[in-house]
From Swiss-Prot:
The active site is at C117 (proton donor). CDD domains: UdpNAET (cd01555). Its main location: cytoplasm. The lineage of its organism: Bacteria, Pseudomonadati, Pseudomonadota, Gammaproteobacteria, Alteromonadales. It comes from the Bacteria. It is found in: Cytoplasm. It catalyses: phosphoenolpyruvate + UDP-N-acetyl-alpha-D-glucosamine = UDP-N-acetyl-3-O-(1-carboxyvinyl)-alpha-D-glucosamine + phosphate. This is UDP-N-acetylglucosamine 1-carboxyvinyltransferase. GO terms for biological process: cell division; cell wall organization; peptidoglycan biosynthetic process; regulation of cell shape; UDP-N-acetylgalactosamine biosynthetic process. It holds the Pfam family EPSP_synthase. It comes from Shewanella piezotolerans (strain WP3 / JCM 13877). Belongs to the EPSP synthase family. MurA subfamily. Cell wall formation. Adds enolpyruvyl to UDP-N-acetylglucosamine.
Amino acid sequence: MDKLKIEASGALAGDVVISGAKNAALPILMAGVLAETDFNVSNVPSLRDVNTSCELLRCLGAEVTRSGDDKVCISTTNLNEFCAPYELVKTMRASILILGPLLARYGKADVSLPGGCAIGARPVNLHLQGLEQMGAKIEVKEGYIKARVDGRLKGAHIFMDMISVGATENLLMAAALADGETVIENAAREPEVVDLANCLIAMGAKIEGAGTDTVRIQGVESLQGCDYQVMPDRIETGSFLVAAAVTRGKIRCIKADPKSLEAVLAKLEDAGASITTGDDWIELDMQGQRPKAVNIKTVAYPGFPTDMQAQFCVLNALAEGTATITETIFENRFMHVPELSRMGATMELEGNTCIIHGIEKLNGAQVMATDLRASASLVIAGLVADGTTTVDRIYHLDRGYEHIEDKFKGLGGDVKRVK
């Protein structure tokens, strides 16, 4: 099994090209099921989860072809299966996003209950309740969600009990082909939701309010394929910016989206970074200074993203001062803390809050990735730790970061993939 071997690397410097957003690409690929003609998606990152999504679409009978580094073409002409099997779904929670498109276009879907990162319960009840309000008959048995509808789904007024990105996306796709108007209240506002909505609009959907907490969808009878470019990955961008801050370096992220990262950039400035932005780039310069400790509380967008929490644990571990990081989105999302403690970090957990006392140096150690973003934090820690750090179970990392070792090498990082 692959591992990453990391040596202390000094200040990162240079330009890094940001990949397409995993969390936008996955729902957009699933939306291909809604299109009656060929659907061409570009800026698709080469990741394990993307490969799983393509395999799932092929399993349903769709023709999926990849060309170049970042292009995917989907044709549903021969789609004739309506079951997303456990073997595929168990490795990726986002497989649940096939439910809405299959049900909306074909009237039936059997989807295995999902797997993915081990960071909390993340129930699917909001997806199911919304689809039931749109007229679907749903039962959960033998580990599968079995959904049926006679004719088209019906537009509905849906109030979501809690903000859920996945449920908002599933209902958005289902409502695009429903009969009548659907209103989703307390909808997720994440940029990836907006990207999906923009893609659906390019396919012929009628959607208003994406990016606000109330989204209105006027259902149409059919959607057509289009050419669509996935947005840049704001979490990959943030991860490289934190790595530069921790190593006291200066880097520029190219093909980035500064507007989607405002909460993260504000915290990096609080930590002492000088931030400059253009339309599609972000430059961070620490001017050789040690970061200052910053308090973090994860909240739904436009607040501070839970997917950047682990990286800021590393920043605070090496910062000047003491900070608290409070996780409000997922339970069980501090599994990186014991691993960072093995490297010498001074951290203590109290419920959903981590108290971090900054120290000057970490020490290299053998550590284990427990989920996608935790694994990124361990790589960042390895870049500034004395000695060698080995990160095991990096299949988590490959789910969400494209060519991460090559990108760090391009910035001067000593990161190697080994067996």
